[in-house]
Design a protein with these regions (language model features):
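Short helix-capping segments at alpha-helix termini
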Residues: 1-4
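Structural signal for interior beta-strand "rungs" in well-ordered beta-sheet cores
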Residues: 9-124
Length: 125
């Protein structure tokens, strides 16, 4: 199958560090912030007012919802969804295939795919 190269769309009000890397097909919405040396994979959505801080690695097909905040040096695996208003503390890894619920707070590594909610998070599915 032939490889496709999709457009990357960045809203004019988004703030992206010159040292950040953004994959093809990724959409960065209004007032989103992507800071220094962050790497965002292909096909991601960095939604309105979301922030991805320094040195984060965001896998492919990740959705960071409206107002979610990802602190520095966070690693998020492929096909993970971070819910509206969620917070991920610094130096945390989240494996691929996870759902982090709205308003959840992640303060430790997530090593098993599933659905996590609460403050701090707990696995529910």
């Amino acid at each position: 199958m032939a490889s496709r190269n999709f457009q990357t769309l960045i809203h004019p009000s988004a703030v992206i560090s010159p040292s950040a890397q953004i994959g093809s097909g990724t959409v960065v919405m209004a007032n989103a912030v992507i800071n220094a040396d962050a790497v965002v994979g292909k096909g991601c959505i960095i939604n309105t007012c979301a922030s991805v801080d320094h040195d984060c690695v965001i896998g492919d097909y990740v959705h960071i919802s409206v107002g979610a905040h990802i602190a520095g040096t966070v690693d998020i695996g492929n096909k993970t969804w971070i819910g509206i208003g969620a917070t991920v503390s610094n130096n945390v890894s989240i494996c691929g295939g996870c759902i982090i619920g709205a308003g959840a707070v992640v303060i430790r590594d997530v090593n098993e795919s599933g659905t996590y909610v609460g403050v701090p998070i707990r696995k529910i599915k």
